[in-house]
């Protein structure tokens, strides 16, 4: 009888939900994001101690109570938020996003809504507080990742059968978001994840990726904003953090869009980021190959010329340390950006449509041509309705440029090309005016092609 009543309550909630009106953030308040181009993503939590990735609780069907006991061993003796922030700054990153809580439900902050948090762990520390302070000391914008779901709640998997439990999950989500938005000063960015998982009917494995489990009904309830009351929550967050940017993974359109481990087409009408891993896993797994400097630069440029941001993930070890090889690779990228950052920061993608060869980014009356793959002897581009005043290569010799009407052809001898990125600066008479491209979202959750992968 109780199960039947809970199923009826579930259906009533879905049928009677009326969303509140919610507005996207003012474009002027999002300019910092468009200008930043590059940020650090950090996946870190109890799962890091098991060294099998952030999904280990679910993917290996671990006992929830046994998993919770890991908190008693979570000392994080090498955790140093300042070292993390310095690594991000040295890499040329302008903001950071930390997993304040992942799908396992463990909070890295002092939550009064759940005892499953870092203050009740062996470390007895508020890691989010330390992280926020470190970001501000290094002049970095502060971002929070938060997953509304919690694998410890059976109501998440089957809310129609465990509706009261699902409502407890929902309340925990709402209350913890209010804690995060209230207790840590100004927060610049909120990166949701998990509203879309629909685990009542979906599963994932490294071999198959996402697949529908045979015999299960499609769990559309978790794709619906009615369960989380997304619009209401967004408005409450806005009242506490009026300048915050929020992504599109919480049942609404978002201030900015997420493209997970893919690039897709150029899009200039709305901010977006493409997130990827420096070592092919979000949570820490030892021995994973690290992206080369060339791969990192190619990923960054491929995203920038499409008018997006590159959010690059680092997964620290269980004790809170970043692997030296990853820190060194980030520093190498930062050194490169020290030289050529003007072609990246503060630019917009365009006015030339990108291709596998590379693309262009512009700022004011200057266009920066980034050639990351020479597929022919020359690169031909067109910048209409503007007169070329001057041009010069930034990192190569013996470049040639010839004009033919409103098009121009760039040629660089093979032995003079920069295999990381051949950059040509074009100066025009007038400021670049380009209408841009309105993007159409594709499968933003899929593991698509486009980003370079470590071998």
What is each PLM-predicted segment?
Residues 2-455:
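Mature catalytic domains of secreted/periplasmic carbohydrate-active enzymes
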